[in-house]
């Protein structure tokens, strides 16, 4: 599969806010930093799609925003899977693919 480099921007600061949003991703996992919103489960999306799926699946788990690696309470974290998915073998993108 080809890997288009058109994913949503992912914050790299130590305290990354994970919230829901209406943004769309071409590939990877979307970690928007727009608050306050309901926190959603994250889901990897596929590349090479002219009509990309939403970054999240509608399964609200926490009613408020929270910061990772912060000293603030983060209720409901045990219900959120933050596994990162990678694609080690990606073919170069071509116009017909992406």
Swiss-Prot record:
* Acetylation among keywords: yes
Tissue specificity is:
Wool.
Record's GO cellular component terms: cytosol; keratin filament
Q: Which GO terms describe its molecular function?
A: structural molecule activity
Keyword list (alphabetical) reads: Acetylation, Keratin
Question: Residues bearing N-acetylalanine?
Answer: 1
Q: Which InterPro entries match?
A: Keratin_matx
Write out the function statement from the record.
In the wool cortex, wool keratin intermediate filaments are embedded in an interfilamentous matrix, consisting of hair keratin-associated proteins (KRTAP), which are essential for the formation of a rigid and resistant wool shaft through their extensive disulfide bond cross-linking with abundant cysteine residues of wool keratins. The matrix proteins include the high-sulfur and high-glycine-tyrosine keratins.
- What family does this belong to? Belongs to the KRTAP type 3 family.
Q: Subunit structure, briefly?
A: Interacts with wool keratins.
Protein name, UniProt field: Keratin, high sulfur matrix protein, IIIB4
Q: Which organism is it from?
A: Ovis aries
